[in-house]
Amino acid sequence: LYTLGYNASKKLINLNLAVKENLKTYLSQYRLMTDAVNIKDAYIINIGMKVNFIARSGFNKDEVSLKIIERAKQFFNIDRWQINQPIIIQELAYELSIVEGVGAIVPPTQDNPNNLSILITNKFSSADGYSGNIYDINYATKDGIVYPSLDPSIFELKFPNTDIEARAIGDSIGNQL
């Protein structure tokens, strides 16, 4: 059984030994005589995201950018995610494309070898508060889906206010920024 918990700030953490022992004791009443209960920590893969967009004419690009960030926060709300759930880029792109003021989602050109509409990056620096787990997002991305590790793991947008970058690159009447 692979587990994780979260702290008061809803950031993923490994469960302490007391919680694991309580869980093991509770589950033992439902196991068969020959079964064993092994509780292990799942891996946390911290991510960031970059999205470029074209704003509709008449909309403030900064306000649209903030709305995109809010929608991305909702998409990556940890209560909506499970261990080993992949990130389907097209679902995220659709969610962001229906934000008021967004004309189009445009693939970032820098550091985007798969030319995806939204760039997902690995944030791993322990010194910056991340899990320390390094994960090759580009290698794990196939056909617009970011797959988790073969080891039980979960994607987490740990610091959404800094880990989400939304950049207006133009507007719907052809002005480039």
Language-model regions, residue ranges each:
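Acidic, low-complexity glycine/serine/threonine-rich segments
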Residues: 1-177
